[in-house]
Amino acid sequence: MSLREITSPDEIRDTRSFSHLEWGAFLSIDDYNHREEIVLGHTPMCKNRLKSWGLYIEDGTRVAACETLERPALVQCKDGKIKSTSTFSIGAVFTPKEHRGKGYASVMMKQMASGIPFKPTLTDADIIKATGVSDVDQTLRVTPLWSDVGTFYEKFGWIGTTDLQYVFEVDGSASQNGVNGTPNGTNGTNGVNGHTNGTNGHSSAVKYLSEEDVYRLADVEASSFASDFEKFPFKGSYKCGIVPDRTVYEWHLARAKFLAKFAKVPEPKVFGAQIGDSWMAWHHMYNARELVILRAKLAKAEDLVELIAAAKNHLCKDGFSDQINKIILWEQEREWNHIVDGLSYDAIDQAIEKSQGKREHRGSSIPAVMFVEYKLQKDAMEFVDHGKLTWC
């Protein structure tokens, strides 16, 4: 059996005809191909960085497939030096029903773990521009994935982390927790570029964020990522983090806008909220019935209450609450705000409790990571700042 890159457009579409059964959601196969090729395939994050791979048996039959996505990242070494490199995220791991139960997925992942597909296409200049770190070391290449099958991938060397998250229910009423204003960005003075009248009795204004607002904030955060990343402690020999630049947001928001008509909801115009120096950006996941927080940057823990209330208000007033009934915040956002922004865990927990959030295990999309170089795979490494934003 051999692992090979799938380069033929026709074979890539044929591969999608199988994965569509798992991830097609509301889409026909034609719409699914359009989303992958045109809507997402041409986003800067995917263009020339997304590759398809197939496992082939001796007669040439493709029995399993997956995708890899190359993105710039930082790695801090045991000597304290920070270097930039490429990560190769693995997604869309799929075995057609007729080939299941024969160990093909295991064979494919063993071959993926051997490093066959992980040849960098990003130039050093691309990586330096994205990371701000001029010391590029591609021997430190990393391959993350987000497991939907528990600890399955750990036997091939991937190191799993937490699947803890916080869930905030949305009851569909016109106003949530005292939030006022109309966030939809089309009518009234409280649109995307306007402000609400404050939430929960606070006088501070909450601003709803347009797509461009989110990109502007992402640019600011990406420029400080190296210094923020350095603050994050690690117990092992290495730590790794994918750069949270605007290209990652572009991919998520393009999905949400494209899928809206198929989910029979308005195309979203609001993608986050901000109060003072605190902000969050979100992604509408209609098939999961979730508004997932891509990023939460908190100057004060109590601002989380305002931002969650604003998110609930957006869902209720902008016509999404019939399709989306919960807000999801991954545990990694709590960790990042505690370490990088110096907020106490207790204060964040109190804000989550005040927002009626509950902590639970996701059971899916479990972040895991491994070095590409075999000689490094036995070294302990921590995957930091790997919330929903960098999921793929």
Curated annotation (Swiss-Prot):
GO molecular function ontology, one term from the record:
L-lysine N6-acetyltransferase
Q: Which pathway does the protein contribute to?
A: Amino-acid degradation; L-lysine degradation via acetylation pathway; glutarate from L-lysine: step 1/6
The regulatory note on its activity is: Activity is inhibited by 5-aminovalerate.
Keywords, in A-Z order: Acyltransferase, Transferase
Q: Name one Pfam family in it.
A: GNAT_LYC1-like
Task: Supply the EC number(s).
Answer: 2.3.1.306
- Which BP terms in the Gene Ontology apply to this protein? L-lysine catabolic process to glutarate, by acetylation
Q: Which domain of life is it from?
A: Eukaryota
Q: Show the catalytic activity.
A: L-lysine + acetyl-CoA = N(6)-acetyl-L-lysine + CoA + H(+)
Reported function = Lysine N-6-acetyl transferase (LAT) that catalyzes the first step of the lysine degradation pathway.
What is the name of this protein?
Lysine acetyltransferase
Species whose genome carries this gene: Yarrowia lipolytica (strain CLIB 122 / E 150) (Yeast)
